[in-house]
Amino acid sequence: MKTSRRGRALLAVALNLLALLFATTAFLTTHWCQGTQRVPKPGCGQGGRANCPNSGANATANGTAAPAAAAAAATASGNGPPGGALYSWETGDDRFLFRNFHTGIWYSCEEELSGLGEKCRSFIDLAPASEKGVLWLSVVSEVLYILLLVVGFSLMCLELFHSSNVIDGLKLNAFAAVFTVLSGLLGMVAHMMYTQVFQVTVSLGPEDWRPHSWDYGWSFCLAWGSFTCCMAASVTTLNSYTKTVIEFRHKRKVFEQGYREEPTFIDPEAIKYFRERMEKRDGSEEDFHLDCRHERYPARHQPHMADSWPRSSAQEAPELNRQCWVLGHWV
């Protein structure tokens, strides 16, 4: 029983620790959702094709930078269109650049157009005003989720170290199961609220941020993996508590049945005889009392050298034992 309890406690502690590590990592990282954003290509400067996205050898190949350069030269000579407008032959998605981005609970980071480094903005500022309250509620739920995981982990460790005391271990086990279940429910609600806020932000967020395509990232997978480990730890803890209680009750029942002595036959003549002896209150009745005590607790009522009552033989001991029980002389 002790070995199985310890094994279940170790499994619950390991699952709770995994859930805590996954939840903390997901809460602090920015890869809950990731994808690409479509942004317009920067215009070509009048100084040549140095700032054009298709400059160099590729410009001649695809023929897209040459018209832009010609338009820039025409504008500089005064023969171009009024207002200095530049025309491009690019259509469709060719007019845009695609950059990668990844978003977490706290920040949204986007790749620079130059390809060097990232630019991060607060995701709370990007969320629509109607969703900021839900987002803050999600943040608070995530914090409570991690705190309750810490409390449950601490209680499980205490229960593991106090496994020798069954009663105290059961109390700690019950509280650890309750805190772990509550943390799992809070974590599930927090993850779902953040997902809802992100989907609304994709539709109603700033124009320069809205994703062209997106999917869930590894932080999102860690968050739900943490929830899975948390619920597995709570189920293991509840299972350990239930099995320990059942085993404890079963052993107690066996113990009580093994030590319960019920007489199978009562001799009326023996009852009458011993009642008469009790009424006389003579010295022989006292010897009978001592014989009964000696039969019940032989180590506690050892005779002294001066004692002279007759000891019961091996054949007489069961009968004397039964008669003493009948008359209620057990002490």
From Swiss-Prot:
TM spans (from-to): 9-29, 133-153, 174-194, 218-238
A Gene Ontology cellular-component term: postsynaptic density membrane
Top-level taxonomic group: Eukaryota
Location, primary (coarse class): membrane
Family, similarity comment: Belongs to the GSG1 family.
UniProt function note: As a component of the inner core of AMPAR complex, modifies AMPA receptor (AMPAR) gating.
Protein name: Germ cell-specific gene 1-like protein
Organism of this sequence: Homo sapiens
